[in-house]
Amino acid sequence: MGRQEEIIQKDMQSYLPVFSRYPMVLDHGNGAYVWDVNGRKYLDALGGIAVNVLGHNNPDLVSAVAEQAARLIHVSNLYYTEAQAEASDKLSRLTRDGKVFFGNSGAEANEGAIKAARKYAHTFAPNKSQIITARNSFHGRTLATLTATGQKKFHKGFEPLPTGFDYVDFNDAAALESLMSDET
C-alpha cells in the first residue's frame, strides 16, 4: 500500500464521512496548482469550494499571515482589534455605510441572513416569515441552512426541520412568482 492509500485509510478510521471525497491526498501548492503526496501536479480549479480563490503559497499572503499570526491568531468579537475596525470600516463604505458582521463560514453567513430576514419580518411584517430558496442549492450544514438547501437527500435523518422554506427551480421565474405570497 502506498503513502496516499495509507493516509486515506487512516483518515477513514476517524473522519466522519459527511460528503464524498476525491481519492487524492494533497501535500502542497503554489499559485493555481497543487501536488499530491505522490508528486502529481493538478490545476486547483475548486478554489476551496468558494471559501477563497487566493491560490497557494503567495509570498505576500504568506508574509501577511505570518505577521498577523505573530501578533494575534484569533480573538473573540468580545474584544476590539484594529484590524477588525479597519476591515469593517472599508466593507461598510463599500456597502453604503451598512453594518458588518464577521462570521466563520458560509453556513454562518447564510444562517445570519435567515435570522436577519426573520427578525425584520418579526419586527416590521409579522406574517412574512416564508423564505424561498432554489432546488439543488447548498447553503450549509446548520439546521436552518440545511433546510434552506433545496436537496432532499441532505434533509433525510434531520427531521423535523425548521418550517418556513419553499423551493423553486433555478431560472423558473413563473414558479418563483407563484410561490410569492403575503407570507414571503
Where are these predicted regions, by residue range?
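PLP-dependent aspartate aminotransferase-fold enzymes
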Residues: 89-184
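Glycine-rich loop-to-alpha-helix module at the N-terminal edge of alpha/beta enzyme cores
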Residues: 41-126, 130
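Active-site-adjacent loop/helix segments that line or gate small-molecule/cofactor pockets in enzymes
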Residues: 1-30
